[in-house]
A protein has these predicted regions:
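Extended, solvent-exposed, non-transmembrane regions
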Residues: 1-251
Length: 251
């Protein structure tokens, strides 16, 4: 008897992950992952008020269900009251990413929200027109075709490291990914209290069978200047709100 083919769900949500090398080595992670059989998993987190990265709460969930002929994977996450080292703040990070599979993979960015972003004491407005363009491209092939004709989408892809062929179409990496930023600006750099910060906004990886969204990634390194009296420079990486959805039929 032949082995029965079945669909294996794959969904992951990371609300907060950090690798901090200074002032002391720490790994911090909070994540949920969906079993291959589907179902639903959720997690509600709070954060140590004395930590370098603080938030009021973070809620994460992943689900996998079949609707008729379609296998749907849905990843959801929201973070409220974010504060990174006292220099990066956001009122709300929220995202819902869905993958649907019938004969091919299609994706839908249901919600991608960044509200009340403050960087080193200054309010930073973000433009989400690239998100609107990406939403109109549920498959990799449609995104490639749109990028060849849309200068703003092409600029976003190029700023995230995507290369282009002679005809102006984006060229996926060896892993089959296209990268872009869903917000403009896609990155912000600044220095504060003896630390250099590089903040990446709305990093999005698009492949034929998978999409991954990282809402905020913060890279921190000590500068040559000393930290203020009583303070400490910071070194490490912080990731806030990362979603990944896909799935496949096996064997």
């Amino acid at each position: 008897m032949a082995v029965q083919r079945r669909f294996l769900y794959h969904g992951e949500v990371v609300a907060y992950a950090a690798r901090l090398d200074q002032p002391r080595l720490r790994d911090v992670k909070g994540a949920v992952a969906l079993p291959g059989t589907g179902g639903r998993v959720s997690l509600l987190e709070t954060c140590d008020p004395g930590a370098l990265v603080r938030f009021d709460y973070a809620a994460s969930s992943v689900s996998g269900e079949r609707y008729g002929e379609a296998y749907e994977t849905r990843a959801t996450c929201s973070i409220e009251g974010l504060d990174v080292c006292g220099v990066l703040r956001a009122d709300l990070l929220s995202a819902v990413l869905t993958s649907s599979h019938v004969n091919e993979h299609t994706f839908h960015e249901e919600t991608v929200t960044l509200k009340g972003l403050w960087v080193n004491g200054e309010y930073r407005a973000t433009d989400s027109q690239i998100l609107t363009r990406v939403r109109a491209c549920p498959t990799l092939s449609k995104l490639k075709a749109a990028a060849a004709e849309d200068d703003r989408l092409k600029k976003s892809l190029a700023s995230a490291g995507t290369s282009f062929d002679e005809s102006g179409r984006p060229r996926p990496t060896s892993a089959g990914d296209l990268a872009c930023h869903l917000f403009d600006p896609g990155s912000v750099r600044f220095r504060a209290d003896g630390t250099s910060y590089e903040v990446f906004l709305g990093e999005y990886l698009v492949a034929e069978r998978q999409r991954r969204l990282t809402m905020l990634r913060v890279e921190m390194k000590p500068t040559d200047a000393a930290a203020p009296a009583g303070g400490e420079s910071v070194e490490g990486t912080v990731i806030l709100l990362e979603l990944r959805v896909n799935g496949y039929t096996h064997p």
